[in-house]
A protein has these predicted regions:
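Short glycine-enriched nucleophile-adjacent loop
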Residues: 502-509
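Cap/lid segment of the alpha/beta-hydrolase catalytic domain
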Residues: 372, 376-491, 498
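A flexible loop/linker signature enriched in serine peptidases of the S9 family
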Residues: 33-43, 66-72, 91-100, 126-132, ...
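Beta-propeller domains
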Residues: 31-63
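A short helix->beta-strand "capping" segment at the edge of beta-propeller domains
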Residues: 1-19, 58-63
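Non-catalytic accessory segments flanking enzyme active sites
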Residues: 18-21, 32-33, 42, 133, ...
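Conserved beta-propeller blade repeats
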Residues: 14-28, 65-89, 128-144, 173-190, ...
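Beta-propeller blade signature
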Residues: 45-48, 157-162, 205-213, 262-265, ...
Length: 509
């Protein structure tokens, strides 16, 4: 039976802020918040680590709107660093697509209200039709390094932090696309990812390394990992990251799974990559946007978000090849960041909505600050159950099945969901949009059709040459599986999806 008071549509959709990109800065935690009540404006907030009762300070008040439009999808509109007691922010404002800079002092104070802006925000670049994003701050040369997209071309550029209305200085011209910059701690080396048409970065990409001269120019660019466009079997790389010992870590999928590899010395290219943590699990996601993060150095080990059978977990990985799972209750993880035995991420689980997770790795403690107050009691929530079935071509396929509140039988209506992407994945974190239906007596099956990520490269490549066929067959097979199990009425089946999932939805009709 449906609930006596089903979840209202106004509660299920469009009211909860979306949190992104948390970052540890000394004893402070900064994050981005996209606000539905402000027409989707994104702003940056900061408060002291672990002090959930304190009021965060909004660093970028209205009308500032943090958004990058590189490759349309954008990502990483803000770069933040803390050096010698000064907080520095560089951001892209969607109002003019310009790069802006501001700095604060007062971080020794008791709370965020003690922060004092050194000066008003300074516009670093002039308005233009170009898009900027995905940057890092080069402290040694007091500049921002990032990507500019203009006239359909990507370039790596630099922008000085002490000048206004500049034209970005071009440092490197890739063949097609570039992103995911990583600057070594000494400022002497820069790594980034490139990919070429017609590949997406999760199909085939390369990790490029270059030296920075004293003047800040790039020299001696080398491809050091990934797949060449001419190779029949693509290799994808994800999130290059420097470790304190000067080694470089990246996720790549030549094994069939996005696993982590470490290069012991980026200065000695004759040394070999070390695959220290082989596993039939994923440690990366499809790179739709800049700024994605699934790994972070916690001061002692590499902390990694790992996807296993559609669920995410945290592991601590030692440079000796050891691995241990971090005990915490959340199985949907994104935007991982860590420092000095602490970690933050955006997380949820089947009964807890999206929020900011803070972890004290030394003590093994955690706390979670939801983006919004709980909209449902735990006993009112339908928890997703793993469903494996024979999909297109008889291949084993995954979905999350949410039974209607009160239980399912052969007369229950069923909603099939086809996610976007198509390289995205159906996650298990609490979705009020799904609970809207289950609270009304509907079952919901959220299908990880062929082409979804989180299940290895072979699963992801099922859709190649078969988009509109494999995904359609998988969604239909999920519904038929539940009908055969007498969990759904064959005459009461609906399907929904947006973007790529909208195409699948229409193709199913």
């Amino acid at each position: 039976m449906p609930l006596q008071q089903p979840l209202p549509a106004t509660t299920a959709l469009g009211r909860t802020p979306v949190l992104r990109a948390p970052q540890l800065l000394g004893d402070w935690v900064l994050w981005l918040e996209q606000r539905p009540h402000e027409k989707g404006r994104t702003t940056a907030l900061i408060r002291r680590w672990w002090e959930t009762d304190s009021t965060p300070l909004e660093l970028t008040p209205a009308p500032i709107n943090l958004r990058s439009r590189v490759h349309d999808y954008g990502g990483a509109p803000l770069t933040a660093t803390l050096t010698e007691g000064t907080l520095q922010l560089v951001w892209v404002d969607d109002n003019d697509c310009c790069l802006w800079f501001q700095a604060w002092t007062g971080l020794n104070g008791a709370n965020a209200q003690s922060l004092q802006a050194i000066a008003s925000p300074q516009r670093l670049t002039s308005p233009s039709d170009s898009a900027l994003g995905g940057g890092v701050i080069d402290h040694a040369r007091s500049r921002w390094l990032g990507v500019i997209e203009e006239a359909g071309c990507d370039r790596l550029v630099s922008v000085a932090l002490d000048q206004g209305h500049q034209t970005p200085v071009v440092m490197h011209q890739p063949a097609d696309f570039a992103g995911y910059l990583a600057l070594s701690s000494d400022g002497a080396q820069l790594a980034w990812v490139e990919w070429q048409q017609p590949s997406m970065p999760w199909d085939c990409s390369q990790l490029v390394l270059a030296r920075l001269t004293t003047s800040g120019a790039l020299e001696d660019c080398h491809v050091i990992a990934g797949g060449e466009p001419s190779q029949p079997q693509g290799i994808s790389v994800f999130q290059p990251q420097w470790l304190p010992d000067g080694s470089l870590v990246v996720a790549e999928d030549s094994s069939g799974w996005w696993n982590l590899m470490r290069h012991p010395s980026a200065e000695n290219l004759s040394s070999h990559w070390q695959r220290l943590w082989p596993m039939a699990k994923e440690t990366a996601m499809p790179q739709w946007v800049f700024g994605m993060s699934t790994t972070a150095w916690d001061g002692d080990k590499l902390l990694a978000a790992v996807c296993d059978q559609g669920e995410w977990q945290l592991q601590r990985l030692g440079l000796d090849g050891s691995a241990e799972r971090v005990d915490q209750p959340f199985n949907d993880l994104a935007d991982l960041n860590a420092s000095n035995g602490r970690a933050v991420a955006i997380t949820s689980n089947s009964t807890t909505g999206q929020g900011l997770l803070e972890l004290n790795l030394g003590l093994g403690t955690w706390q979670h600050t939801p983006a919004a107050a709980a909209a449902m009691e735990v006993n009112e929530i339908s928890v997703g159950q793993p469903l494996w079935f024979d999909g297109s071509g008889g291949q084993r396929t995954h979905a999350w099945y949410y039974p209607p509140i009160g239980g399912a039988d052969a007369s229950s209506p069923l909603l099939v969901k086809s996610h976007s992407g198509p390289s995205s994945m159906a996650r298990r974190g609490l979705s009020l949009a799904i609970q809207f239906w289950t609270s009304r007596g509907w079952g919901v099956v959220d299908v990880n059709y062929g082409g979804s990520t989180g299940f290895g490269r072979t699963y992801r490549e099922r859709l190649q040459g078969g988009w509109g066929v494999v995904d359609v067959n998988d969604c239909a097979a999920a519904a038929k599986t539940l009908i055969a199990a007498k969990h759904a009425d064959p005459n009461r089946i609906a399907i929904e999806g947006g973007s790529a999932g909208g195409f699948t939805t229409l193709a199913c009709l």
